[in-house]
């Protein structure tokens, strides 16, 4: 399904914002010794709007739903054969670079996280070393009813008690790895513990155990009276659905970006001479898939570009789309910019181009060196190639999944 865009409504405020983003990226980019500081001075969106086609509509990908405030500074890790290899593995075959957040999720899923210790028990039954307390009467009462109760008066205060915080899955997580079990003895061995499924809370297990003795008033009381009203409150209806759109974008743009820099001559001394340079990006070709995920409950929009060769991304489970013949013809007209020093194709299978070159196969740049009122050199190849590489690298590092941008929308 094709989507029409009102391209004329892109105003100067958005253009100024993009100029600031590009300047921050250019200030951190490494430059050759003969290139001075690079700055974007103006941006115009042009009149040619992109061709946008809706190719998929699905649930939000799991990585978009996670809070990554604490993981913003983490770097990817290398995973080999299902094992973490953050310090460099022994076998480099068959590895992939994945976000640290996703690797940590797989690590905890396999039991290597908190409370693991090689135990195959469910998370809510893994326990630390046993301890005794004068208040074993609670535990004895629990054994008589065919259940296990936590030991210690501090179970009511929350310090070292049964529950500690609300987990991400919606069920209470156990403090210190799990409940504290009383020591077995010949007279009071461990009873059969009715283990609740992972989808149920331990409180539900206590309630089911209390059905053995309807006259027991102690077990019929809620373990956490303060939390009981919150559980009974109905959830507020969410009028905004969660959905994820996949858009195929084909854009032959006539936008214009003006960039200024300088050419440095470091002989016979560093920065002996400086020649002003003016570069104008007069157009580019973009062909890629854009993912837009909308969280209705939190009013957030996540945007990223997908790599069609990534089998583990948000669209990795979807069959590959057939390439439009018109797109092939357009790509043939504007082939990717290649290095003049690169060797010709020798007939062997070639590695795929970097994602930046596949997304932006062509970037058209005009260059001028010197002052406008004096002699000017035009079309300096090395400078133009450097600017092309910076643009492709910026798109790859800022927008290609697993990198994505999140927009927080207002309540209005």
Curated annotation (Swiss-Prot):
SMP-LTD domain sequence ranges: 1-410
UniProt-recorded Gene Ontology molecular function terms: lipid binding
Annotated keywords: Endoplasmic reticulum, Lipid transport, Lipid-binding, Membrane, Mitochondrion, Mitochondrion outer membrane, Transport
Keyword Mitochondrion on entry: yes
Topology class, membrane: Peripheral membrane protein
Matches recorded under PROSITE patterns: SMP
Keyword Endoplasmic reticulum among UniProt keywords: yes
Region (Disordered) residue spans: 66-96, 108-136, 166-238, 314-354
GO cellular component assignments: endoplasmic reticulum membrane; ERMES complex
Ranges of biased composition (kind: Low complexity): 220-238
GO biological process: mitochondrial genome maintenance; mitochondrion-endoplasmic reticulum membrane tethering; phospholipid transport; protein insertion into mitochondrial outer membrane
Localization per record: Mitochondrion outer membrane; Endoplasmic reticulum membrane
Subunit structure: Component of the ER-mitochondria encounter structure (ERMES) or MDM complex, composed of MMM1, MDM10, MDM12 and MDM34. A MMM1 homodimer associates with one molecule of MDM12 on each side in a pairwise head-to-tail manner, and the SMP-LTD domains of MMM1 and MDM12 generate a continuous hydrophobic tunnel for phospholipid trafficking.
PANTHER family: MITOCHONDRIAL DISTRIBUTION AND MORPHOLOGY PROTEIN 12
Family: Belongs to the MDM12 family.
Free-text domain note: The SMP-LTD domain is a barrel-like domain that can bind various types of glycerophospholipids in its interior and mediate their transfer between two adjacent bilayers.
Function (record text): Component of the ERMES/MDM complex, which serves as a molecular tether to connect the endoplasmic reticulum (ER) and mitochondria. Components of this complex are involved in the control of mitochondrial shape and protein biogenesis, and function in nonvesicular lipid trafficking between the ER and mitochondria. MDM12 is required for the interaction of the ER-resident membrane protein MMM1 and the outer mitochondrial membrane-resident beta-barrel protein MDM10.
Name the record gives this protein: Mitochondrial distribution and morphology protein 12
Lineage start: Eukaryota, Fungi, Dikarya, Basidiomycota, Agaricomycotina
């Amino acid at each position: 399904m094709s989507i029409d865009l009102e391209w004329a409504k892109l105003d100067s405020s958005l253009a100024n914002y993009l100029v600031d983003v590009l300047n921050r990226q250019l200030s951190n980019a490494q430059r050759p010794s003969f290139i001075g500081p690079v700055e974007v001075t103006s941006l115009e969106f042009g009149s040619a709007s992109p061709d946008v086609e809706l190719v998929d509509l699905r649930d939000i990908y799991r990585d978009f739903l996670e809070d990554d405030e604490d993981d913003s500074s983490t770097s990817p890790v290398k995973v080999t054969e299902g094992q973490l290899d953050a310090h460099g593995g022994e076998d480099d075959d068959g590895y992939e670079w994945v976000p640290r957040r996703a690797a940590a999720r797989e690590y905890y899923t396999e039991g290597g996280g908190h409370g693991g210790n090689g135990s195959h028990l469910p998370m809510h039954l893994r326990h630390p070393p046993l301890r005794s307390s004068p208040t074993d009467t609670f535990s004895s009462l629990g054994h008589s009813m065919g259940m296990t109760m936590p030991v210690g008066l501090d179970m009511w205060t929350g310090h070292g008690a049964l529950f500690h915080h609300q987990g991400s899955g919606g069920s209470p997580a156990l403090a210190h790895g799990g409940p504290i079990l009383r020591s077995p003895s010949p007279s009071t061995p461990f009873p059969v513990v009715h283990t609740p499924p992972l989808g149920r809370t331990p409180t539900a297990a206590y309630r089911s155990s209390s059905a053995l003795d309807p006259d027991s008033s102690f077990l019929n009381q809620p373990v956490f009276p303060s939390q009981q009203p919150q559980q009974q409150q109905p959830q507020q209806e969410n009028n905004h659905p969660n959905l994820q759109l996949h858009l195929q974008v084909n854009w032959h743009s006539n936008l214009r970006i003006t960039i200024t820099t300088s050419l440095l001559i470091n002989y016979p001394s560093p920065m002996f001479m400086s020649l002003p340079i003016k570069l104008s990006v007069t157009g580019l070709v973009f062909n890629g898939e854009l993912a837009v995920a909308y969280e209705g409950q939190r009013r957030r929009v996540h945007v990223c570009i997908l790599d069609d060769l990534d089998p583990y991304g948000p669209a990795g489970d979807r069959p590959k789309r057939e390439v439009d013949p018109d797109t092939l013809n357009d790509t043939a007209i504007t082939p990717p910019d290649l290095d003049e020093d690169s060797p010709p194709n020798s007939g062997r299978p070639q590695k795929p181009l970097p994602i930046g070159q596949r997304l932006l196969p062509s970037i058209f740049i005009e260059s001028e060196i010197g002052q406008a009122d004096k002699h000017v050199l035009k079309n300096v190849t090395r400078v133009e190639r450097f600017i092309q590489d910076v643009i492709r690298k910026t798109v790859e590092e800022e927008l290609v999944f697993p990198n994505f941008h999140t927009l927080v929308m207002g309540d209005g």
